[in-house]
């Protein structure tokens, strides 16, 4: 079974847009076979709340909505005009406020009929609330259908999803949090994961380390799946007929962000993590101020987003040169060449053919030029930050500590006292703290003094110092690798054309396998391994009293979920795992939210402040 999460989410959305009818001419209702059905279908209105707008945006664009008969897409929280002759498709989270708005819309007769779709299972109490309200207004006849869609997750691409649950790390690690709030968040995470596996149509085998949020979420999800599987038929009935052996079912690996803190903080040198960290990529969209989409419709992004930044610059330069060459060829075919050989005035058919070929190539050339310009602008913007903040130096220093376990004290102190934002310096200092089991006291004092000199809020640093001893995993990977010198970006590159970047040597990022990747690889193999032998196992299909030892693997497919925030660095590491595997493996990566280093260090700072640690001080400690 292939884990085609994005495709299956898209299929569900398209069926919903077609009023939950199975489309003719296309097995999945998404391909080109739906054209005639769409042309004959009456137009409709799509009404969503903001969270559902966010989950829809990465999988369907406005033009694609029109293909499926949607002429207007509106936010339920904003004023809307009456369209009494059109059916309305609602996609909403099941909340009391949303139910009340639907009831008010029905009472006002805004639309001809109401096809209500909830992103998760709607509680019975809310259904009764809706029924009572529509009955009181005599508008119940307008409600044509109520459906649970189990779509409450954002699928950014085929192998990456987010539950869009902000600040989960803070909520789960705040010592002052009420037990009821923790339980509610754990249940919400479990419900989001239930939506993911329900969309896939597969009941997973769940593995996690004992204790902490991962075990709490695993237990809640196991209970929810067991309750659902009691009913026949259910969302997994079809999958159950084929997934009879453990290797035919996916593995769901749950991790707590504290399992490896450093990867959420460190700087990276690859194109995609840089764009996310430095330029603020969100939901596959970027604003520079130009607005760009960076997703699987962009062939350059798909092919090069995991390359190191200098390699990306080389590829931009190569594609620009190829584009210019192709433009010159078109000019020659249309008589624009210097010798005009193609058009000698005697071969009308040949000349016409050349002209038609040239004209047909123009749209493709135009799109290529747009793509090249887009990535040139992005790379130029990145280069400005690299120069102004010495980001290459931060990456090299952090990489040396995390991968080699070596410390260049001079470089560390120069960075802490030199270029870079306060967040850059704080991330470097926390990475230093996490890289060594027992930092040298004099080094630690110098690091703290440098942070104070730069007036950096010490809350996150002090918070990590406090919790570090609770988890030996924090030390990070200890793999060794050779070093490489780095050129001075500030003096040699900034202010030059994009071609100036192509000669830069790539910075070392090999040799380090992240802790989550090592654990996932061991869990998928299913062999005895001291790193994961003590992991808990939950199998919702097995009797609670029975042993589930036979379900320990091997597994070909896995869903890896990070509770408290994921990132593109971890996603890349898991992608590389599947690429180097001798057997075919597939891994989907998800998290409560996708965070860059600044966003995560801010959550650590918030926890430090809640604990009364750190703060900003410009004074040096007493000598």
UniProtKB/Swiss-Prot annotation:
Keywords: Protein transport, Transport
Single GO MF descriptor: syntaxin binding
Transmembrane segments: none
Cited Pfam families: Sec1
Signal peptide: none
InterPro entries: Sec-1-like_dom1, Sec-1-like_dom3a, Sec1-like, Sec1-like_dom2, Sec1-like_sf
GO process terms (BP): endoplasmic reticulum to Golgi vesicle-mediated transport; intracellular protein transport; retrograde vesicle-mediated transport, Golgi to endoplasmic reticulum
GO cellular component, one term: Golgi membrane
UniProt record similarity statement: Belongs to the STXBP/unc-18/SEC1 family.
Function: May be involved in the early secretory pathway.
PANTHER family to which the protein is assigned, alphabetical: VESICLE PROTEIN SORTING-ASSOCIATED
Protein name (Swiss-Prot/TrEMBL): SEC1 family transport protein SLY1
Organism: Oryza sativa subsp. japonica (Rice)
Classification of source organism: Eukaryota, Viridiplantae, Streptophyta, Embryophyta, Tracheophyta
Gene: SLY1
């Amino acid at each position: 079974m292939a884990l085609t999460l994005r495709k299956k989410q898209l299929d569900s959305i398209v069926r919903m847009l077609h009023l939950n009818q199975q489309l003719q001419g296309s097995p999945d209702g998404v391909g080109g076979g739906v054209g005639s059905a769409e042309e004959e279908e009456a137009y409709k209105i799509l009404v969503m709340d903001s969270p559902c707008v966010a989950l829809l945006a990465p999988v369907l664009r406005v033009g694609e909505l029109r293909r499926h008969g949607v002429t207007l897409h509106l936010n339920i929280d904003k004023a809307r005009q009456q369209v009494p002759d059109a059916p309305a498709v609602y996609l909403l989270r099941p909340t009391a406020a949303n139910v009340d708005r639907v009831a008010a819309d029905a009472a006002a007769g805004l639309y001809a009929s109401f096809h209500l779709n909830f992103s998760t299972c709607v509680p019975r109490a809310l259904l009764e609330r809706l029924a009572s309200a529509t009955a009181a207004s005599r508008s119940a006849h307008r409600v044509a259908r109520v459906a649970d869609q189990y779509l409450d997750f954002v699928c950014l691409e085929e192998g990456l999803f987010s539950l869009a649950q902000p600040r989960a790390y803070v909520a789960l690690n705040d010592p002052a949090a009420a037990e009821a709030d923790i339980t509610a968040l754990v249940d919400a995470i479990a419900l989001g994961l239930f939506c993911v596996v329900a969309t896939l149509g597969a009941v997973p085998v769940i593995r996690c380390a004992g204790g902490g949020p991962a075990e709490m979420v695993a237990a809640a999800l196991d209970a929810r799946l067991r309750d659902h599987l009691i009913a026949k038929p259910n969302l997994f009935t079809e999958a159950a007929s084929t997934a009879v052996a453990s290797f035919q079912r996916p593995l769901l690996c749950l991790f707590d962000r504290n399992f490896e803190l450093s990867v959420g903080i460190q700087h990276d040198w690859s194109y995609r993590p840089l764009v996310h960290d430095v330029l603020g990529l969100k939901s596959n969209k970027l604003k520079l101020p130009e607005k760009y989409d960076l997703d699987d419709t962009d062939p350059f992004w798909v092919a090069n987003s995991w390359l190191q930044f200098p390699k990306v610059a080389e590829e931009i330069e190569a594609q620009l040169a190829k584009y210019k060459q192709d433009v010159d060829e078109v000019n020659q075919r249309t008589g624009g060449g210097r010798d005009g050989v193609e058009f000698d005035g005697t071969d009308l058919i040949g000349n016409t053919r050349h002209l038609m070929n040239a004209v047909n190539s123009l749209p493709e050339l135009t799109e290529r030029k747009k793509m090249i310009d887009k990535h040139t602008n992005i790379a130029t913007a990145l280069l400005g930050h690299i120069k102004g903040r010495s980001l290459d130096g931060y990456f090299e220093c952090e990489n040396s500590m995390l991968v080699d376990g070596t410390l260049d004290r001079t470089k560390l102190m120069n960075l802490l006292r030199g270029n870079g934002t306060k967040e850059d310096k704080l991330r470097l200092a926390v990475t230093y703290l996490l890289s060594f089991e027992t930092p040298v006291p004099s080094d630690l004092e110098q690091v703290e003094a440098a942070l104070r000199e730069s007036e950096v809020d010490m809350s996150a640093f002090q918070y990590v110092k406090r919790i570090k001893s609770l988890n030996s995993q924090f030390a990070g990977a200890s793999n060794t690798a050779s070093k490489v010198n780095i050129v001075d970006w500030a003096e040699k590159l900034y202010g030059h054309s994009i071609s100036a970047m192509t000669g830069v040597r790539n910075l070392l990022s090999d040799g380090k396998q992240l802790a989550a990747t090592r654990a996932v690889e061991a869990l998928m193999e299913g062999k005895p391994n001291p790193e994961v032998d003590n992991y808990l196992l939950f199998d919702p299909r097995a009797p609670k009293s029975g042993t589930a030892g036979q379900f320990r693997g091997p597994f070909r497919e896995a869903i890896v979920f990070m509770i408290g925030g994921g990132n593109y660095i971890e996603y890349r590491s898991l992608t590389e795992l599947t690429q180097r595997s001798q057997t075919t493996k597939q891994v989907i990566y998800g998290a409560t939210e996708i965070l860059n280093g600044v966003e995560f260090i801010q959550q650590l700072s918030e926890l430090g402040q809640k604990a009364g640690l750190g703060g900003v001080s410009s004074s040096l400690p007493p000598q």
